[in-house]
């Protein structure tokens, strides 16, 4: 079924907060939504498909598109560039698809400061300790990399107030219900005391 009023939803979270899991669960049962496919200058990893996981382009092509104003947001991460093409969003809107845009705070602030209409959600972990445990349980990062992600998380959580909605991902099933409620009703009561407690925990750990 086509969506007559497609929308853009921007989702951000510290690494380990469970953002990817929530998005994946939501998309698996909502066919009118698609995950935005970013353009990047980094080479494909094993198993990645051009146009599915990313749009892989050269540095020169990226620079050309940037000069043309083709991106709604872009950033440099670990010596590679990433960006969201306006043409991709427009194409999906014409098809009646709403877009889930999974980006960091830096990218979101570019969109927030533009005239692009969107609804935004920031996902918080229940505590600093739980965030670190989730990162360690992945068993994919070195201790140094985990510490770097935790340091980044401290910076990122301070921007939660810039977003329209905040979800505390303590229980996945409850979090996905809240996620869906926000997407479909634009309504969610924020427990400010809980948010402040989490922030104090993360910033003072």
Predicted feature residues:
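NTP-dependent small-molecule kinase module
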Residues: 2, 140-141, 155-205
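The conserved Walker
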Residues: 13-15
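Post-Walker A alpha-helix
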Residues: 22-23
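ATP-dependent small-molecule kinase phosphotransfer cores
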Residues: 42-99, 105-109
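Conserved phosphate-donor/acceptor-positioning beta-strand/loop module used by diverse small-molecule
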Residues: 99-104, 113-138, 168-169
């Amino acid at each position: 079924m086509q969506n007559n009023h497609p929308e853009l939803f921007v989702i951000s979270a510290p690494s380990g907060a469970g953002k990817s899991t929530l998005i994946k669960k939501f998309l698996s049962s909502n066919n009118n939504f698609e995950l935005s496919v970013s353009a990047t200058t980094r080479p494909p990893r094993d198993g990645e498909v051009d146009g599915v996981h990313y749009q892989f382009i050269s540095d020169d092509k990226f620079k050309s598109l940037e000069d043309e104003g083709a991106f709604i947001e872009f950033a440099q991460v670990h010596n590679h560039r990433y960006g969201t093409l306006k043409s991709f969003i427009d194409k999906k809107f014409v098809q009646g698809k709403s877009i889930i845009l999974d980006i960091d705070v830096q990218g979101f602030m570019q969109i927030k400061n533009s005239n692009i209409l969107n609804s935004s959600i920031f996902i918080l972990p229940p505590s600093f300790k739980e965030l670190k445990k989730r990162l360690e349980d992945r068993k994919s990062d070195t201790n140094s990399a985990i510490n770097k992600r935790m340091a980044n998380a401290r910076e990122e959580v301070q921007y939660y107030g810039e977003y329209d909605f905040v979800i505390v991902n303590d229980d996945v099933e409850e979090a996905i219900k809240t996620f869906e409620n926000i997407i479909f009703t634009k309504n969610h009561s924020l427990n400010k005391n809980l948010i402040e407690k989490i922030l104090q925990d993360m910033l003072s750990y």
